Amino acid sequence: YSLYDVELLIDEGVSVVTVCWNNSNRFATSAVDAASGEDRGLSPLGRELVRILNDRKIIIDCSHASDATFFDILDISDKPPVLSHSGVRHFRNIPRNASDEVLSAIESTGSIIGINLCPSFLSRRARKHITVQTVVEQILYLSERFSPDILALGSDLEGIRYLPSDMKGVEDIPLIFERLSGKMSEEAVSGVAFDNFFRFFTSVRE
């Protein structure tokens, strides 16, 4: 994509732009590529992309970006980047998951992380041992270690092949919130379900 292509997509109604996918591109270094080579972060063209996205009030998604890319964007962007569908390295140490440093930055800037339901992001254990309870435990950990305000659900249902073993599809997502009930306040559960993302979305788009 060129910057012109990005502008065309925005004109068509796109409101969230991820700077790269699993492979690095002209704009940014990806998390996967950074793990096997040099993490160059954001390119000069990527910095221009951030300027355009800021001008157009577009949410910048760093779910697939390297740590250096995330912090480069954080340094120059009017609004913090979001992790729309990621995991947590504390539980599964893979490049696509968020480090404590990234999570601390998300907390301090009022951004959010959407917890990905991909079993291989949640744990190294066999899928049969990865359940709704696994997701709940990670949400509770993040709520206590950082803040419940950073939390959302970033299921990635259209991008993953498998779900936790006791989930069949989107119809089972309410199980997560049922398990959270009583362990978090009603306000905090509503935040994970909708309110936190909506708050962040409107803060960037307004």
Regions found by a protein language model. Name each.
Residues 20, 154, 195:
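Conserved residues at the C-terminal ends of beta-strands
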Residues 1-116, 120-122, 136-143, 150, ...:
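Extended, charged catalytic domains and RNA/DNA-binding interfaces, predominantly
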Residues 124-126:
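C-terminal helix-coil-helix/basic helical segment that borders enzyme active sites and/or dimer interfaces
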Residues 117, 146-170:
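Short acidic/histidine-rich active-site segments
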Residues 44, 129, 133, 167-171:
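Soluble non-cytosolic domains of exported or imported proteins
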Residues 168-206:
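Mid-to-C-terminal alpha-helical segments outside catalytic/metal-binding sites
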